[in-house]
Amino acid sequence: MSLSARNQLPGTVEQVHLGEIMARVVVRVGENLIESVITRQSVEDLGLAQGDEVRVVVKSTEVMIQKD
């Protein structure tokens, strides 16, 4: 998948906290943890789970998560 966003950080999913509508995903990037709040549907569509290798995509207005 190609993205125009340049701030892409490879990391590993540490935790996924599912709510009724939204979810909180915690990703380890090096020694740091980055949290992103995304829809529960996005977590399900991506099949995100602890241990998954992902990329955190940072834009000026949001933080997204990508799974290859």
Predicted segment positions?
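Non-catalytic connector elements of ABC transporters
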Residues: 1-68
